[in-house]
Amino acid sequence: MLKKVDRKNRFVSMFDPKTGFYVRSGVYDENGKDTGIDPFMTQFPELIDVGVMGHCVHGASGLCLKSGVQCYQNGLKTHHPNMTLENFKRIVDECKGKTFQLALGGRGDVDQHENFAEILQYCRENNIVPNFTSSGLGFTED
């Protein structure tokens, strides 16, 4: 269980990286007693969205259109480079110990990133839980 004490906004949050269980206290008073008031904000985000994908393999191939999915990211025509592993590691290094999760996204299925396994591993090595949503079009038995 990871625990974070936000002294500025006077509350405590805890997160279990194995199960995803998350809990936080209400704002505590000057005596350390929970007031029951929901904290408005935290000093550092507990979940951060990181766009690691610059293009969509499935969108560019027309697979999404064939399956009846309309792409809101214009995946059929847009092609930018994916975030480098080096840049991703810099983000993780800046966030470790301050955030619980990174929501991986961008333009395309994150599981198609050329460094997907390394991205997941680096997050876990630094006690940050990676999460992502995928169309599943690129999933294999592995």
What does each model-identified segment do?
Residues P39-E86:
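Canonical Radical SAM [4Fe-4S] cluster-binding loop centered on the CxxxCxxC motif
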Residues S67, K98-T99:
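Short loop/turn motifs at secondary-structure junctions
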Residues M1-D49, K66:
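Flexible, acidic/Gly-rich N-terminal and inter-domain linker regions that tether
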Residues T19, L104-R107:
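Short glycine-rich loop/turn motifs that provide flexible caps or phosphate-binding loops at active sites
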Residues I48-V50, F100-L104, P130-F132:
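Hydrophobic faces of well-ordered beta-strands that scaffold small-molecule active sites
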Residues V27, K33, H58, H113-N115:
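Residue-level recognition of conserved structural "scaffold" positions that shape functional pockets
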Residues K77-D93, G108-D142:
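Canonical radical SAM enzyme core domain
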Residues S13, L47-H55, G106-G108, E114-F116:
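Short, charge-rich amphipathic segments
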